[in-house]
């Protein structure tokens, strides 16, 4: 919806043309849901960003048992987009590389660890580095590596980190009553560009993932602006 126009003063300060329409926007995840088909086609979506967000939509107004509802009106259609998230997803990788490895490279040192049959010896990562707000509602919960031994390598720890975030997203998915009816999930965000992480997520969820290479919040916001009246 158009809620106003750019004033002469704002135009002079920003360079945006005067009288350009100002369109009511939305948050980054609802915007991403527009261009992935989550909102209008009902296709579940996962955004792998700093946080990991699982989104699905429902007709009309729905108050879910788990997750945050976001009401959307598209034309004459009222939808509810439900968001469930883990707070540390890509953020956990940033912590690992920035604080632990002090490295700018996001590549595994040992490519053998990417083999799906690689023996991980029950090494697990609990990803809630900054609390958990959906299933447990506990801001003080913290992350952990479980199963460490003297032979554990840095690449194994990184694989465990990606697997741990995948299992946390699986826990969110299983909290949605009808998620067993989903036949596929679309994947967006910076983490979606990592082939190994995307495949790990698909394996853990037990469902096909389709990466949306050019979809994201920016594109969704542009579609909102294009459809405004």
Where are these regions (language model features)?
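Active-site core segments that coordinate phosphate-bearing ligands/cofactors
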Residues: 7-188, 192-229
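Glycine-rich, mobile lid/loop segments that gate access to catalytic sites or pores
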Residues: 2
């Amino acid at each position: 919806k158009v809620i106003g126009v750019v004033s002469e003063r704002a135009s002079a300060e920003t360079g945006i043309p005067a009288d350009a329409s100002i369109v009511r926007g939305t948050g980054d995840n609802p915007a991403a849901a527009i261009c992935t088909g989550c909102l209008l086609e009902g296709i579940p979506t996962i955004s792998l960003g700093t946080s990991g967000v699982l989104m699905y939509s429902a007709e009309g107004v729905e108050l879910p048992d788990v997750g945050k509802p976001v009401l959307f009106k598209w034309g004459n259609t009222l939808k509810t987009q439900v968001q469930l998230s883990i707070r540390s997803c890509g953020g956990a990788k940033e912590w690992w590389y920035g604080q632990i490895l002090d490295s700018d490279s996001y590549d595994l040192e040992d490519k053998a660890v990417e083999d799906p049959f690689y023996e991980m010896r029950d090494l697990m990562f609990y990803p809630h580095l900054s609390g958990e707000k959906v299933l447990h509602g506990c801001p003080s919960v913290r992350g952990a590596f479980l199963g460490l031994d003297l032979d554990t390598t840095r690449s194994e720890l990184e694989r465990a980190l990606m697997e741990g975030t995948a299992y946390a997203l699986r826990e969110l998915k299983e909290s949605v009553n009808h998620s067993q009816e989903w036949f596929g999930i679309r994947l967006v965000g910076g983490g979606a560009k990592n082939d190994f992480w995307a495949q790990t997520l698909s394996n853990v969820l037990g469902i096909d993932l389709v990466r949306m290479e050019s979809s994201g919040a920016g594109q969704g916001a542009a579609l909102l602006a294009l459809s405004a009246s």
